[in-house]
């Protein structure tokens, strides 16, 4: 009875049974909410309705499985970038963290003391909150970035020659 209901010819009625949850039976027609078990987490079974904490694995990180309930660190891929998925490849406005300080993630709202690195000192990201000594470069030395903490020799330019930067 199990083979007839869980085989390659899965019927819609018998596919949701608990005794039918096997990796070999995880097909598109057999992947249901009642069949989302860890043993059923294979790439061919990754569907939105199966995105649960027990089924969110590295082999189940597909674009169709990118829902908020399935966004776990092991599923952090470029196709699954959510606020709870802060990784370098997931650099978004809600993902400004120390582990996300990459050139592709340099946003004005990401200019924080923890994310202000030489790789993040671009002209368009020269905001006052990002003025740090390690960001004092020729491309980041502007009038809005002339702070005492940014007064180093390599950053001293004519347009930074103000009283606070002398």
Swiss-Prot record:
<keyword id="KW-0677">Repeat</keyword>
<feature type="repeat" description="18">
    <location>
        <begin position="105"/>
        <end position="109"/>
    </location>
</feature>
<feature type="repeat" description="6">
    <location>
        <begin position="45"/>
        <end position="49"/>
    </location>
</feature>
<dbReference type="InterPro" id="IPR002494">
    <property type="entry name" value="KAP"/>
</dbReference>
<dbReference type="GO" id="GO:0045095">
    <property type="term" value="C:keratin filament"/>
</dbReference>
<feature type="repeat" description="13">
    <location>
        <begin position="80"/>
        <end position="84"/>
    </location>
</feature>
<dbReference type="GO" id="GO:0005829">
    <property type="term" value="C:cytosol"/>
</dbReference>
<feature type="repeat" description="25">
    <location>
        <begin position="145"/>
        <end position="149"/>
    </location>
</feature>
<feature type="repeat" description="3">
    <location>
        <begin position="30"/>
        <end position="34"/>
    </location>
</feature>
<feature type="repeat" description="5">
    <location>
        <begin position="40"/>
        <end position="44"/>
    </location>
</feature>
<keyword id="KW-0416">Keratin</keyword>
<feature type="repeat" description="19">
    <location>
        <begin position="110"/>
        <end position="114"/>
    </location>
</feature>
<feature type="repeat" description="23">
    <location>
        <begin position="135"/>
        <end position="139"/>
    </location>
</feature>
<feature type="repeat" description="10">
    <location>
        <begin position="65"/>
        <end position="69"/>
    </location>
</feature>
<feature type="repeat" description="24">
    <location>
        <begin position="140"/>
        <end position="144"/>
    </location>
</feature>
<feature type="repeat" description="26">
    <location>
        <begin position="150"/>
        <end position="154"/>
    </location>
</feature>
<feature type="repeat" description="20">
    <location>
        <begin position="115"/>
        <end position="119"/>
    </location>
</feature>
<comment type="function">
    <text>In the hair cortex, hair keratin intermediate filaments are embedded in an interfilamentous matrix, consisting of hair keratin-associated proteins (KRTAP), which are essential for the formation of a rigid and resistant hair shaft through their extensive disulfide bond cross-linking with abundant cysteine residues of hair keratins. The matrix proteins include the high-sulfur and high-glycine-tyrosine keratins.</text>
</comment>
<feature type="repeat" description="11">
    <location>
        <begin position="70"/>
        <end position="74"/>
    </location>
</feature>
<comment type="subunit">
    <text>Interacts with hair keratins.</text>
</comment>
<feature type="repeat" description="2">
    <location>
        <begin position="20"/>
        <end position="24"/>
    </location>
</feature>
<feature type="repeat" description="17">
    <location>
        <begin position="100"/>
        <end position="104"/>
    </location>
</feature>
<protein>
    <recommendedName>
        <fullName>Keratin-associated protein 4-4</fullName>
    </recommendedName>
</protein>
<feature type="repeat" description="15">
    <location>
        <begin position="90"/>
        <end position="94"/>
    </location>
</feature>
<feature type="region of interest" description="26 X 5 AA repeats of C-C-[GRQVCH]-[SPT]-[VSTQR]">
    <location>
        <begin position="5"/>
        <end position="154"/>
    </location>
</feature>
<feature type="repeat" description="16">
    <location>
        <begin position="95"/>
        <end position="99"/>
    </location>
</feature>
<feature type="repeat" description="1">
    <location>
        <begin position="5"/>
        <end position="9"/>
    </location>
</feature>
<feature type="repeat" description="7">
    <location>
        <begin position="50"/>
        <end position="54"/>
    </location>
</feature>
<feature type="repeat" description="4">
    <location>
        <begin position="35"/>
        <end position="39"/>
    </location>
</feature>
<feature type="repeat" description="9">
    <location>
        <begin position="60"/>
        <end position="64"/>
    </location>
</feature>
<comment type="similarity">
    <text>Belongs to the KRTAP type 4 family.</text>
</comment>
<dbReference type="Pfam" id="PF13885">
    <property type="entry name" value="Keratin_B2_2"/>
</dbReference>
<feature type="repeat" description="8">
    <location>
        <begin position="55"/>
        <end position="59"/>
    </location>
</feature>
<feature type="repeat" description="14">
    <location>
        <begin position="85"/>
        <end position="89"/>
    </location>
</feature>
<feature type="repeat" description="22">
    <location>
        <begin position="130"/>
        <end position="134"/>
    </location>
</feature>
<feature type="repeat" description="12">
    <location>
        <begin position="75"/>
        <end position="79"/>
    </location>
</feature>
<feature type="repeat" description="21">
    <location>
        <begin position="120"/>
        <end position="124"/>
    </location>
</feature>
